[in-house]
Design a protein with these regions (language model features):
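Short S/T/G/P-rich N-terminal loop/turn motif that feeds into the first structured element of a domain
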Residues: 1-91
Length: 91
């Protein structure tokens, strides 16, 4: 199960941190161990670290209206979203 970091900009840190939408959207996709991070120098720059059992399912879900609505609710600026997937060195 890969660990993934998604970082992006937001409109309001306190609203984003308090929102249940992350869990509501990602939980049914099997995403676990969701942790949030805030840049102390720029609190509108944030990240989410999570374990994702099915990357294809999550990436497919990210293109839905439900994902767009969840991001809009949370104040995410979707054009700033970058997703990084845990990588292992080649053997």
């Amino acid at each position: 199960m890969p660990t993934v970091i998604a970082h992006h900009d937001i409109k309001d840190k306190d609203h984003w941190l308090a929102s249940p939408k992350r869990e509501e959207f990602l939980g049914p996709l099997g995403v676990t161990n969701i942790r949030t991070f805030v840049d102390p120098q720029n609190p509108t720059r944030v990240a989410v670290l999570m374990d994702i059992p099915d990357m294809d399912a999550v990436m497919g879900a990210m293109g839905t209206q439900e994902a767009a609505d969840a991001m809009a609710h949370d104040g995410v600026l979707p054009e700033t979203l970058v997703i990084l997937v845990e990588a292992t060195p080649p053997s």
